[in-house]
């Protein structure tokens, strides 16, 4: 009898803790699968922008007439600053031109129409054939569109840990390296100009060049960009 009561107690205790975790993750919503916003989730860590922004597109059911894509530099462009455009900023860290077409197609599907404008920020690193391989876009889309996705996250330890981090950032108003608000606008910690100058001066040319030691120009780079354009004949392209 005592053993049976122990098992019941242990089982109920686990349910209690799992319920608390689920409620907290739902309240914080670190992967943007729900729509509630409040002061406690006002800053969201950019842990996986591909998944988070795909989730936002999939679950929010909004329509846009322009799509913005690019690397981490482009994430800091405020999508609300474009005049006469309703833009969704779908840029993310280490974006590679070869994967952009699949993200555009996913965005068009959620948008339920073609984009009038597709804006792409390109940089030199995108021409590197030997760039690190990113997560397969199909894996991202399959994960986000899984019927159980948003509910699995409620019991995810990673989502729980991320929720705690987001709570800290929101309460302390410290975005860290990069955080987003609930409107998909990115923020970062502002450094004193003298500190920035000091860091730049301390960075050697050799250190910067070492990042390109495996660089090889992708001979198909132009073809990749041409495919993006030909796949979207109803869109006007703005490239910078």
State where each predicted segment sits.
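Short extracytoplasmic
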Residues: 44-68
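Short, flexible loop segments at the rims of nucleotide/cofactor-binding pockets, characterized by
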Residues: 42-48, 93-97, 214-217
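Alpha-helical transmembrane signal-anchor/signal-peptide segments
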Residues: 28-51
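Short alpha-helical segments and helix-capping/turn motifs at coil-helix boundaries
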Residues: 49-55, 100-109, 223
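Hydrophobic membrane-insertion alpha-helices, especially the h-region
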Residues: 8-29
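Secreted/periplasmic serine-hydrolase-like ester/acetyl group-modifying domain
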Residues: 122, 131-236
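Membrane-embedded segments
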Residues: 65-154
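Hydrophobic/aromatic residues located in beta-strands of well-ordered beta-sheets
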Residues: 118, 237-239
